[in-house]
Structure formats: C-alpha cells, structure tokens
Amino acid sequence: MGQLHFFFFPVMAHGHMIPTLDMAKLFASRGVKATIITTPLNEFVFSKAIQRNKHLGIEIEIRLIKFPAVENGLPEECERLDQIPSDEKLPNFFKAVAMMQEPLEQLIEECRPDCLISDMFLPWTTDTAAKFNIPRIVFHGTSFFALCVENSVRLNKPFKNVSSDSETFVVPDLPHEIKLTRTQVSPFERSGEETAMTRMIKTVRESDSKSYGVVFNSFYELETDYVEHYTKVLGRRAWAIGPLSMCNRDIEDKAERGKKSSIDKHECLKWLDSKKPSSVVYVCFGSVANFTASQLHELAMGIEASGQEFIWVVRTELDNEDWLPEGFEERTKEKGLIIRGWAPQVLILDHESVGAFVTHCGWNSTLEGVSGGVPMVTWPVFAEQFFNEKLVTEVLKTGAGVGSIQWKRSASEGVKREAIAKAIKRVMVSEEADGFRNRAKAYKEMARKAIEEGGSSYTGLTTLLEDISTYSSTGH
C-alpha cells in the first residue's frame, strides 16, 4: 500500500480552519499526503504556516475552489463566516458553500484521495465521498461532552419539563448530573419551528450518521466517560487525536496561527516575563462572539474591580471606544495590556505568568486553556459553549462561571461587573484557587503525554490511519 492521501476541507471560519491546518500538519508529520481545500481569500490562513513547516519535511498542498459569493447575494469579498453582513445571510453563505460540490468532485476525480475529512457544516460531502467510494470523516471542532449533551437534549427534550426559563433541568442519560436552564439551549432546539437553520442542522445530523466516523480535537484522559458514552452508548466510530494546537512546538507557529498578531510576540512575552507566576488574567472571547458596548463597559469595570493584572484582547471592529470607562487605560496602565485585534493566544496561555483565562468556551479556546494548564473563568455566549462550560466547571472542575445564562447569537449582555470580579477572584485568589490550578496543571500534563508516541491521541491517529489503509485496500 502506497502513501495515504487525505483531503481536509474545513468550513470557512477561523475557528474551523485553524484546527484543520493543525490536523493536516499532524497527519503530514506521520507520512500522510495532505491536501487542504479552501477558497482564494482564505489561502492566507494556511500558506505561511505551510511554508514555515517545509524545512521539517512536512509537505501540505492547498487546492482552491472559487467561492460563489455574489451569485448567492453576498458581498464579493465575503468568503468567511465572520464576514457575513448579518445573520439573515447565513443561509446564503451555506448555499454558496454547497455550490462548491461540483468543483470538489472534479478535484477528487483528479487526485483520487483515500479519505475526505470535512467539516460538519459540509453535510453534502458524505454523498460526494460515497460517489467515489472513499470514507468521509466528520470534523465537528467540538468536544465529545458537548455532542453527548446535545444528543440527549435533542432526544429527550428535558427543557419541556420546566415551568420557567430560570428553572434548571437535569440532562438525562449522562455519566454526570448536568443541569441547564432553557435559555442555555439554542433557540433552534427549543422553539420547534422549522427555519433554514434548523433544516441545515437536521441535514448535518443525518449526514453525520451516514459518514464513516468522527475525528475529535480532544484526548481520552480529558473526557474519558464521554468518549466511552459516544462510542459505546451512542455507537459512533470516533478517534480522539488532540490537542491539535500542541503540534505547534515552534514559537513562530504558536504566535501566528490564522492571522498575523496585532502585537509583536516579543513585546507580549516581555510584558508577561515581568509578571509573577499565575498572576495575570487573560481575557479573550474568540473571533465570533459579539458583546454590546454596555457589556464591554461592565467587563472593563469587572476586570478593574478584581484588582488583578490582565491582558485583554478586544476585537478591532469596535471603532469608537465609548465603551471604555473614562480613565480606565490610565488607571490600569501598570496592571494591564490591551491588545486590539488578534492575539498570539497559544503563546500567552503557555506562559507561566498567566493564572486564569476568561473565555467564551468555544472548544478551540477551551482546549488551548487545558493545554496551557490554565484555570478558566467561563462566559459562554452561543452555539455549544454552554455545554463546554459545564465540562470545565462540573466535570473537570478547573474553573468557575460568571453566570452567563442567555444563549445569544447577536450580542452578549446582562452580566454585571460584580459577578465578573467575583468569578475572577474566585479562580485567582480564593481558597479554591489552588484546587483549580492543581487540577488544570494535571490536565496539561495528561495532554502533553497524550500526543507523545505511545500516548492515547498518538495511538488514536495510528488507529485512524490503519482503518483508512484497510478501507483503501479492501474498498470498504
């Protein structure tokens, strides 16, 4: 059997493309021929890192498919989820993505890969793969835990048994007692109405169940009960091969994942080097979560009231800075560093001065926090983030929440400065802080071992490659 060839096709969003790039690098480092499929305006996300890894003998090819934005009523430059002008245009975006099917089939015809690893949001790729008799493996970009919770919520609809939005219900049939409120479940799930998005989600689930299996950016020791639940109780074929961000050993790779950082990495490291171990709070809400100006104002006041040193990453599209409390930067200039734009997150979380991570609980960020051994202050906003929060606070017990209870795609609001300061202090300086820290450090060590030769994720990838090799030689 010759060299295996994998196609990697992420949906065009930073939170999906970056782990896919890491995954392609990981597969290539194990002797696989890796090809990433993307669109012309997203090539930059991958190209620099691919160039940088050439000297290590890691060869990754990029193949481009034109994105039909204009034909689907989107602005010409709109080739990424974060560039969509409004949520109303989400269906247009996915319609445009579906039009990439024919060019993808031409590429498969030409290159004859052995396997297609594609994003959950590309459900039509299951049929494409079947057409060429190659396995399609789904990449969700989230945790085993979140998918187990989501599955139970969908099947059992426990949110129907409560009389108010604030009353908690237990999610049935899980290894732990997980409690949620109605407003922490996505409106698509709880409304029961059919919309373009609910139809899309249904298609994604059906396509999932027909696919060959699912690959996870996670590791067995982190979610043991839920890996078992997903594979044995729900009966799905799955491989845990993460944390993918840990394949970035090089300082350049850690610093420049996805976009160029808005701060010089040396300046950032110098600032962190001048601080005591575990003394800095890192605040960052990913590339998609939106906050109202009043919520950002409360966050600033909460950070200041916590009395802790901090690095705060603020998205640049907030042109006017009316939300910054008057004199905030002046008062906190010794204590804090504000980064406007994109930060070298993995580099920051790996630094010993960082003692807590205020996060929206997107899975990439959550796992990067775990890999850095950093306790978390959880502030979920939408998607499956409320489920990931429960994994951190109830199962791993490596963090505490600010009390965010409202699933909101547009803009998070309603969390008060007192709650923010209290959660930060609880994780940083309360009598519980050492416990959070020790558990977080233990998971960091487990993560490191998982990706080393003989570790659970290393072995998981070996198994995946063997499975595909067998499939290729037998045709099933």
UniProtKB/Swiss-Prot annotation:
Stated induction or repression of this protein's expression: Up-regulated by elicitor, salicylic acid and virus infection.
Origin: domain of life: Eukaryota
Keyword Cell division carried by entry: no
EC number: 2.4.1.128
Entry binding sites for an anthocyanidin: H16, A383
Coiled coil: none
InterPro entries: UDP_glucos_trans, UDP_glycos_trans_CS
Record's catalysed reaction(s): scopoletin + UDP-alpha-D-glucose = scopolin + UDP + H(+)
Binding-site residues for UDP-alpha-D-glucose, renumbered to this chain: A343, Q345, H360, W363, N364, S365, E368, E384, Q385
Glycosyltransferase listed as a keyword: yes
Residues at the catalytic site: H16, D119
Matching Pfam families: UDPGT
Similarity section: Belongs to the UDP-glycosyltransferase family.
Protein role: Glucosyltransferase acting preferentially on aromatic substrates of the phenylpropanoid types. The best substrates are scopoletin and esculetin. Required for full resistance to virus.
Name of the featured protein: Scopoletin glucosyltransferase
Annotated gene: TOGT1
